[in-house]
Amino acid sequence: MKKEQLVADLEALCAPIVKEKGYDLYHIEYVKENNEYYLRLYIEKPEERISLRDCEIVSRALSDMLDIEDPIKDAYFLEVSSPGLNRRLHSDEHFNRFIGKEVFVGFKSSLSGRKNVKGILKDVQENEIIVECEGNEIKVPKDKIKTANLEGEI
């Protein structure tokens, strides 16, 4: 099974349990780091901070279900956490949600002589996002985005 399909299947299995516990699933990833596999889920609650106890509640519920369903054949570590203040933006839903907020966007390759841009996310279109930086609107094609993060406010 391809990784993308596995992640989609895992999201379909995990999202209802996360929701049942009173949280939203922000993002899920299955990665290999230093010869170890990790299933990472990032959870949130609208207008509330995520505590260690929140992560524990979701982790226990997911662990029980994953032991029964056994969707991952390799040994792996389950990690549940908050996406944090400087959360990664992965989808159009994430970008749209944070229009008007400060973001940092790194590019896969140079764009108009720049490697990245930091500014206010102004708009999200089908194939690009628009970031206002120092009074200029910079159009960033989505296929040029290497990483995008919300710049958290404390």
From Swiss-Prot:
Record keywords, A-Z: Cytoplasm, Ribosome biogenesis
Localization (cell): Cytoplasm
Pfam assignment, any one: DUF150_C
GO BP, one annotated term: translation
CDD domains: YlxS_C
Main localization category: cytoplasm
GO CC annotations, alphabetized: cytosol
Reported function: Required for maturation of 30S ribosomal subunits.
HAMAP family noted in UniProt: RimP
Similarity remark: Belongs to the RimP family.
Protein name (Swiss-Prot/TrEMBL): Ribosome maturation factor RimP
